Design a protein with these regions (language model features):
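Active-site entrance/lid segments in N-terminal catalytic domains of soluble metabolic enzymes
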Residues: 1-142
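Short His-Asn-centered micro-motif
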Residues: 57, 150-151
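Short, surface-exposed recognition loops or helix-turn segments adjacent to catalytic cores
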Residues: 64, 149-150
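Conserved active-site-proximal phosphate/metal-binding subdomains
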Residues: 110-148, 154-296
Length: 296
């Protein structure tokens, strides 16, 4: 059956219930984009559903604590790409008497939307290893907020490097697509298994930021004006302006990401970090964690 891209509190609750069955009493996090419409409602719904942590990127969440005041034990973790952004967040959060539980610093090799201009994604000064230290120094000014590195981290060597810089941990996403447990359609995984390094590119997005993904048939159909028609149903992200930006770039991001998740190779948008082409076989999360911790 066709599923429209509306937000559903019941669906969110079901996702949390399923995740809770797997993780038990361990901390459970929700990643909620600041750019979505009804951001505050979704944050509150996630807290009600049992989130222990809320992670937010796609904007600078200066009022994030406003929506969790009834849930004081929920840790709030913003995603930033500069020390300046962290300083602004911490200053704004003073009125809520709150500081971030941690901060994620995402460099320009990550999959999906970037916190940089297109040309800056290629400049040395904006690479993760060069933006991480100023954020760590800024974090010390607010009580040693734990700093988590993200974007292009692939193996134990990368993990060890950023831990040595003073990071408390790392965030990884793309490599976990190549696991049996990842719930994306097998055809999504095949796209990465078959991708070459040059296939993973930066592209335009209705959100107004460069986004990294695998160049597939969707990009060719956009160029040839044969991509699926843009019909804004849910008004999901504010920068898209009810589908106006989607029509300019040639695709609806919610529809195309949904198509990729369901394995539609013809019309799907397959986000991936810059190292996605390195996935060469599907393994278990257990095996992957052993590789990441033992360096195999």
């Amino acid at each position: 059956k066709e599923v429209l891209n509306f937000y559903s509190k019941d669906a969110l609750k079901e996702i949390f219930d399923n995740a809770r069955k797997i993780c038990g009493n361990l901390p459970l996090a929700a990643n909620i984009l600041y750019a979505i419409n009804d951001y505050g409602r979704v944050v509150r719904d996630a807290c009600e559903a049992g989130a222990n942590i809320i992670i937010t990127g796609a904007g600078i969440p200066t009022n994030m604590p406003e929506f969790t005041k009834d849930f004081p034990d929920v840790a709030l973790i913003p995603i930033v790409s500069s020390a300046r952004a962290l300083k602004l967040i911490c200053k704004k959060w003073q009125r809520y008497n709150k500081i971030p539980g941690a901060v994620i610093v995402e460099g320009p090799l990550s999959g999906g939307h970037q916190g940089f201009k297109y040309e800056d994604c290629y400049k040395e000064e904006f690479q993760l290893e060069n933006i991480i230290t100023p954020v760590i120094e800024e974090a010390k000014n607010w009580g040693n907020i734990p700093v988590i590195a993200a974007g292009g981290i692939w193996d134990k060597k990368d993990i060890d490097k950023f831990i040595s810089f003073g990071c408390a941990g790392v965030q990884m996403a793309t490599r976990f697509i190549g696991t049996f447990e990842c719930d994306a359609d097998p055809k999504f995984k095949d796209v990465l298994l078959n991708a070459k390094e040059e296939d993973i590119v930066l592209m335009s997005s209705p959100v107004g930021l460069p986004a990294r993904g695998v160049k597939t048939n969707l990009q060719f159909s956009i160029e040839n004006h044969t991509a699926p028609k843009v019909q804004c149903i849910s008004n999901c992200v504010a920068p898209c302006n009810r589908g106006h930006e989607a029509k300019l770039v040639g695709y609806c991001i919610a529809d195309r990401l949904g198509a990729a998740y369901k394995g539609d190779v013809e019309t799907g948008l397959f986000f991936s970090g810059s190292n996605g082409y390195k996935i060469d076989k599907i393994i278990s999360v257990k095996e992957l964690m052993e590789k990441l911790t033992k360096g195999e």
